[in-house]
Amino acid sequence: MTNKKAFKEACKFIAGGVNSPVRAFANVQSEPKFISHGKGAYIFDIDGNSYIDYVQSWGPLLFGHCDKDIQKACQKALHKGSSFGAPTLLETELAKLVLSDFPHLEKIRFVSSGTEATMSAIRLARGFTKKDKILKFEGCYHGHSDSLLVSAGSGAATFNSPSSLGVLEDVAKRTLVAKYNDINSVKELFEKNKDIACVIIEPIAGNMGLVPAKQDFLEELAKICKNNQTLLIFDEVMSGYRASYLGSYGINHIQADIITFGKVIGGGLPAAAFASRAEIMDILSPLGGVYQSGTLSGNPLAMAAGIASLTKAKKKTKLYDKLGKLAKKLTQGMKKLADEKGLPLQACHVGSMFGYFFTKDPVSNYQDALKSDLALFSKFHKNMLENGIYLAPSQFETGFICSKMDDKIIDTTLEAVRESFKRI
């Protein structure tokens, strides 16, 4: 079966033919590639084509596809059972592994997705502060729960629907939206609203393209939250263990009240988490009145994969230096080639995360990101795919470097960039 036929058949049985909108490739006027398998830095589609994969399952695969250590851990766990709906030692082991590196985090709760993690963190913040409103930032994406699907990035931005049908006005009105990297917009909202339970932010935004928050902005944001008895939530579902081993904390050293984790923490399996100090976490059921649960939360296969992934990342002290150097080489190379061709391009990286925009002006917020030439992006994406490079099919997503990549792979990618630019 070909990719084309597979998508046609999928559309008969699956809404939109995919189980997450951006996978449909609709924004780049194309059809999705159906993947048969992956190995290291590469994925292979059912037509027999191979691609250097810079999506890496949208971030979880720090060690690439089919990493032997993670596979071995999963196989060992599976041999004992796939799910119990009861506590296992693996949950405590992964909890200790995460908390040992964050001095301000004392307890953690595992869930199955980033959406669950942020949704639960919001409920927890409201329960702790006894306040109703939340503040988020335009273009930041925190999953598809109703209160957070307002002025969102990621797939919502990709399909030009930053909010969603079905989100009730009564819910949306309790979500305040500020401008990313603009502290004055935050101050204005706090002046008008005294009942803000929490501020949630991607400290390294990866869902409007890659746009890191400025250090002074985050420092001032933390002060405002503290002065107003408002909890600060860092959504590190994407940046955790990606931007650095300690995520944004390893870069900006700001201690958020609650941190959400995902992607890498599950080693490629469905796992996420939220963590905070004990006085906050202890109001979760069964100790307190904030309810959260999940049949597959703490699934043993996901816990085993997470332990293997984080243990390996922690042991390889030079891993993040290597990934950062490769990302820097890629983004600087793309910028140089674009300049030579006379194309407007902004490119940056934070650790193993990278992003690029087809615009002449620097990008520091969602409105800047929207200035990117989407037609140019679509042509570039199509050309790169034809040259064997698999990039996210959306201008408003982030790319990822994995440990199986090297200088040769980056050189091959940059040659594909050169050829792709020639055809634009």
Report the location of each language-model feature.
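Conserved N-terminal phosphate-binding loop of PLP-dependent enzymes in the Aspartate aminotransferase
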Residues: 1-424
